[in-house]
Amino acid sequence: MACLDVALAGLAGADFLSSSDLDQVQAEALLTLAAQLKAGSQRFDLTGRVLGLIFSKASTRTRVSFTVAMARLGGQTIDLLPLVTQVGRGEPIADTARVLSRYCDALAIRTFAQADLADYAHWASIPVINALTDEEHPCQALADFLTLREAFGHLEGLTLAYVGDGNNVAHSLMLTGALLGVNVRIGTPEGFAPDPAVLERAAALAGGRAEISVVHEPVAAVRGAHALYTDVWASMGQEQEQAERERAFRGWCLDGELLAEADSRAIVLHCLPAHRGEEISAAVIEGAQSRVFDQAENRMHVQQALLAALLAPG
C-alpha cells in the first residue's frame, strides 16, 4: 500500500467540516494525491472500512462519487437514508453519532444546518465529512481547484470568477481559493452576496497571497478571469424563491458575451445540476471551454484522496 505524503499525516482521524479545516500545504497535497490517484500512480487499500452516508438532501454526484471512491479504495458504503432510519423519526444526533461510530469508520453527511454537522462531529469518534450544508460545500471546491490546476498547470496567481448566488459553493470557493493563492471574485446582485463572516475568514486565510472580493456587476466580475463559474440561482430548499430570484438575476447568465470578457484561455465550471438558459447558456456549458464534466469526475478523485488521508492508520 502507498504511503501518504507527510503533509497529510495530520488529517488521519480528523473531521472535514469546512474548507478552512485545511492549511495551504494540506490542500495542495490533497490535490496532488487526487491527481496521482486519477493517473493510477498511487493506490491505497481501505479493505474492510465502511463509510456511512447520511444524506438529508437529494444528491447525484456527491452520493455516487463517494460510493465509487470508497469502492475503488477497497472499502464500502452504507446508505443511511433518514426516512428509513431513526434519524428521520427524531433520534438525537448525539445517540445516532455514537452508535454509528461503533459500526462505521467515517461518516459523510449532507444536511441543511452547519450546526447539525458540527453536532455529529462532536459526538462521533470517527471522521465526519461535510458532503454539503447550507453554509459550505468543501469537497466540491477541492474538485473545482483540481480542475483549474489541470487546465493551467498551476494555481497561484490565477483568478476564478464566480457569478451567481453567494451560496455554499461561493463560500467554499472563497475559502479554498484563499488557501491555494487563487484570486476569487464573487459577482452577485445586491442582496445576494456571500456571508460577510465567510468573506472575512477567507481574507484572513489568504494572508495577502490572494485577493478575495465581491462585486455587483457581471462584466466587472469576469473581466480577465481564468475560470468562470456559476451555480443555480435557487438552491435546494429555496424553490419557493425561484421566480423572485429569476427576476433578481436577470442579466447574470453566463453566456457567450460574458465569456468573451474573460481571459482567452478561460475555462467554464458549474457544479451541476445546471439549468440551461437560466444561470448558464447551453452553448457555453457545451462549448470548447467547458470543463464541467471533468470537474464532476474530479469529485471522485479528490474524495478518494480525502478518504485515504482521513482513514490512514494514525
Identify the residue ranges that each predicted region occupies.
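Rossmann-like adenosine-cofactor binding region
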Residues: 203-283
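Positively charged, low-complexity intrinsically disordered leader regions
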Residues: 1-68, 136
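Adenosine-phosphate binding glycine-rich loop
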Residues: 265-266, 271-314
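Phosphate-coordination loops involved in phosphoryl transfer and adenosine-cofactor binding
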Residues: 46-51, 156-158, 265
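Short, structured coil segments at secondary-structure junctions
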Residues: 73, 103, 123-125, 180, ...
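Phosphate/diphosphate ligand-binding glycine-rich loop within oxidoreductases
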Residues: 40, 46-149, 276
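Glycine-rich phosphate/diphosphate-binding loop of Rossmann-like nucleotide-binding domains
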Residues: 56-69, 152-230
